[in-house]
């Protein structure tokens, strides 16, 4: 079966109306530091990164009309890569040859792999896997080895901890309000933040902190030592992804909690270096950023052979991450990102066919492909003529 067309699209899903019984979730109030936050005219509070653009989708159609869908980040920047660079490379080729197609796209990007190009590759690869599952009549998790567990254990990311506990979660990741240039006052604020979280979730719950690349080695070591009494399950992405030597030093020095990183590492080669250097105890590829499912499977193999666990970034909230975690033995849990209001059903912002968390677990759809059930009239072509400029929100801390 040949690929007939590859197109970038967007999903025009109807928006869910807010209920008077809900209140705004952590994305609207939690102070979170990011690398750009060292400059006070950039926000530290909104859920999106300053300058980020909306997600886009890839629609791959086979000769018989069957289609697959996959999504990717940095949509407005990467959409042209899909339509004008990748599409003509793979149209007319075997739709089931996911390994060949992944390798073709990867080799075609020599010289500009990573970042925007790899995000575009992610969407194409996911759409191809979705199409492959549909053509073969199998869920994707069956195509990558079959289920290794009955359900995927989840940890919830957010600061609405009481609500998250009420929903049945027992594993939690909280935000980081501290950027290293704030000095000892900011560090004290962070310690108080973690102490409150530990008090709410209890001593037996898993608790994790995500600094989002906001530290240097010195501050990361000081933070890890100050937070030692609160028994973090892991310390996530304290440094920028390019600081391999910094991660090596941190992992050598921090022995009381696991070190995790990887969501901003792109493609197998970046992870090969990370794993070979044993620079982390847990790696966290994002399937929509790092090259898709094909790349993530290669990354998993590197890590598994080295005794390093793979827990995908945002994996529990996406169909692709759910299928991956169900199938891979050394992927003990997945991340459920809390993007709904407090009191709002978790499924309200999910697309049809994406499984919803229940009691801290999720069971992926067993429908062919990734199980997406998106109405065709929601799928509209990407409008390249309507490119919007990135939005940089003013700081709410000024």
Model region roles, listed by residue range:
Residues 1-11, 15-41, 313-398:
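Flexible C-terminal active-site loop/helix
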Residues 3, 65, 86, 124, ...:
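Conserved, mostly hydrophobic/aromatic
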Residues 46-50, 346:
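Short Gly/Pro-enriched turn/cap motifs at secondary-structure boundaries
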Residues 56-62, 354:
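Short beta-strand elements
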Residues 68-70, 150-157, 172-174, 205-211, ...:
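Hydrophobic faces of well-ordered beta-strands that scaffold small-molecule active sites
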Residues 80, 225, 231, 242-261, ...:
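Shared catalytic-loop signature of beta/alpha-barrel
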